[in-house]
Amino acid sequence: MQLPVQLSPPLALAVLSIAACQIALVWWFQRKRTNPLPPGPSALPFLGNAHQIPLQYPERIFSQWARTYGGVMYLRLFKKSVLILDSVKAAQDLMDKRGAKFSDRPQLTLITDVFAFKPMMFTMPYGDLWRRHRKWYQASLESKAALDTYNAVQETETCTLLSALVSEPEHFADQVKRFTGAILLEIVYGHAVTSVKDDLIRLSDEMMTQAVSAGSLVATLLDFFPFLMHIPEWFPGGGFKREGARVRHLMRQLLDVPFNEVQQAMLEGSGKACLTTYMLEEQAEHGDLTPDDVDNIKGAATLLFIAGTDTTITSLLTFFLAMVLHPEVVHKAQAEIDRVVGRTRLPGLMDRDALPYLDQVLKEVYRWNPPVPLGIPHQVRDDDVYNGRHIPGGSMVVSNIWSMSRDPDTYEDADRFWPERYEGKSPDELARSDPRRIVYGFGRRLCPGRFLADSSIWLAVARVIATLDIRKVRDAEGKEITPSAEFISGAVSHPKPFSLDIRPRDEVAAKLIAQ
């Protein structure tokens, strides 16, 4: 059968192209109809679900919603699609197994454009520059050979921590900050810390305090309404620019000062091996350093210092809070260390496998108060389908790590601090219940410093328990003051300020600390 009209080849190609586009559009709309969005609470026009999310402890309302809508929920914040993952399985299925699609990062306007946290891997979109930073971290933080080189500084700083806790127990939180900062500054810059008043530790602490004070509301509004960046400082709501300028000034110092010290030491031939010298030397192999190269090295070094410091401090302060509330845990862990290690030396990293109860204590610290309760959001690159539900490309993906750490199917009586929950489990059950599989994130954006952080925390915990008694302080009438197990709402979940009494267990422990 002949067509009544003969089409020229170019015209025929155009007609076929239009027809193909129409078929594709029909298929796409049918796909949208046959694959509904994940369930979630009803949204309002314009606002979406923004009015339903509290500024304080949003992870808790997400956890409540998950009981109704399941482990994968869809929200809309203004015009932005947001996927809340309340299930470990969903987080692993999407971010671990579909990393090519789920490893991007949403625009974090306050952090990148106002605070100038850049170029830093945690704010970068998934791409070549991100891979470059990741390669630097992997070489320095994820191989056993590299991690072994840090044992000496970890050993030294834990001994310094013990002495400081005994001499100034009332300032234990400052000593924890010094301990954490000292390890990271030595590893990142070859910078030796001799005091809690170290300039770089003070600078980092001040910068993080100022950044947190800017508030999550400003961050949310800027991310969804970037035009707010253009309002003047004097305009109502423009105060974030003044606060941002202070943070930016402090961040500039953190980027420049330690890096310049390292460069100067290298020029003088007195540079110490550290992450920054490694990155400089590695980059020099590819030619002269460009200004972009220098900026990237500064950003990679600074990120490891500030991010590693804040989360490690949180875990150690959570440990102290748990121990003052649960002296029976301290006594049980002390008995294990005494039996395995003895009283003539301090426990070391080589003892870790022989101290299972101590490892349970640390697992429970991570689970009881995950340092970053909602993780750092990912972004979906392209449309996807999961369990028959449509996931729009460009959606922000938030992992509710806090809720995952309280999954009743895995953790009975989840609000209770109870290291014994990990006893008597099969290898599969132990792997499934280990909170370290969730607290450091998921997929290709898994925290690269997790092994260093975990070993530093373990060594500090082991040596504190081996040598010190942690007790409640007493008031003027001699009554014990029991601290509250409460945590500050925010990107990082710090325990609310509390007091405790720290003393050597006995004369044997005091001598070990003094050595």
Swiss-Prot record:
Heme binds at residue 447. Keywords: Heme, Iron, Membrane, Metal-binding, Monooxygenase, Oxidoreductase, Transmembrane, Transmembrane helix. The keyword Transmembrane helix applies. GO terms for molecular function: heme binding; iron ion binding; monooxygenase activity; oxidoreductase activity, acting on paired donors, with incorporation or reduction of molecular oxygen. Its cofactor is heme. Its main location: membrane. It is a single-pass membrane protein. Its EC number is 1.-.-.-. The chain crosses the membrane at residues 9-29. The keyword Heme applies. It is found in: Membrane. It is an enzyme of class 1 (oxidoreductase). Pathway: Secondary metabolite biosynthesis. One of its GO terms (cellular component) is membrane. Belongs to the cytochrome P450 family. Cytochrome P450 monooxygenase that is able to use delta(6)-protoilludene as a substrate to produce delta(6)-protoilludene-5-ol. This is Cytochrome P450 monooxygenase 67. The gene is CYP067.
